[in-house]
């Protein structure tokens, strides 16, 4: 998935962390909407906010810069880059939040129906992937035994 950050005319010191709908799309869970959400370091946020002072947002302490199609946050529910970037997947010019941390963010917002649906999609993917690995490691005799047991 290619995301062109050049419109920002900004050099990040750490790769921005892709979250939200585009991260859902990256994992093949659903298509994203028009906006592209990132979390960045406090250092990068301070510099980006200085560059776009008229594009700042504050959602209950979560500070963001909303410019072009990007919503770029210092934190989400006060969880910062260092917390959310653990086990992120490196891409060209940015990172993608781990599936487990994406699940965590969706759980925090699950009172909103859209995010509850996302939560279900992520849980289903995690379980499907885990059981696929388990199944592939079984011998054909073990697979046959399970198939007979469940028919």
Predicted regions and their residues:
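Compositionally biased terminal segments of proteins
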Residues: 1-151
């Amino acid at each position: 998935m290619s995301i062109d950050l050049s419109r920002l005319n900004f050099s990040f010191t750490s790769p921005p962390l892709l979250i939200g709908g585009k991260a859902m799309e990256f994992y093949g869970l659903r298509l994203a909407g028009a906006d592209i959400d990132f979390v960045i370091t406090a250092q990068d946020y301070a510099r980006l906010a200085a560059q776009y002072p008229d594009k700042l947002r504050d959602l209950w302490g979560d500070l963001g810069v909303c410019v072009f199609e990007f919503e770029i946050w210092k934190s989400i529910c006060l969880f910062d880059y260092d917390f959310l970037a653990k086990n992120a997947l490196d891409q060209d010019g940015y990172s993608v939040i781990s599936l487990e941390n994406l699940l965590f963010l969706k759980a925090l917002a699950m009172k909103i129906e859209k995010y509850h649906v996302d939560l279900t999609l992520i849980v289903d993917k995690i379980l499907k992937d885990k059981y696929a690995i388990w199944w592939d490691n079984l011998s054909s005799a073990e697979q046959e035994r399970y198939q007979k047991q469940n028919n």
